Amino acid sequence: MILIDKIVFGKYTIVVRNKREDIAMLIQFSVSNFLSFNEQETFSMIAGKARKNIDRVFSNKKIKLTKCEVILGANASGKSNLVSAFQFAQSVIVDGLPRGFSNKFFRLNPENKTVPSEFEIELLCCSKIF
């Protein structure tokens, strides 16, 4: 498991100690109206109810999360665009909105030009869900 020492959100920094209860982990990431994503799509790290391989699951009193996920899919199914959405959201948090961001909407629906792109990030940090 990778332990994060600090998380930077623009001018805010969360320092995380390397204790089990102070681990920072992604819970889920959602995106809509961005590149090939028209409707909201969610990448989730929430663990299922399987009882096998429990060493691959991080759990505390609030939630159970998988420690690792794999993105699989056919060619042109949106894998690279999901990674681009992660990178875009990160750059907005750290650096603010970049120039030219308005042309990244889902172009197959002409109405989406006036609809905002949406990103939702849910994190577990210091035993709290943000």
Q: What does each of the following model-derived ranges do?
A:
Residues 17-87:
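Pre-Walker A-like glycine/lysine-rich segment at the N-terminus of P-loop NTPase domains
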Residues 64, 69-70, 74, 83-130:
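Conserved P-loop NTP-binding catalytic core
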Residues 1-2, 6, 11-17, 21:
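Short, positively charged and aromatic/hydrophobic N-terminal segments
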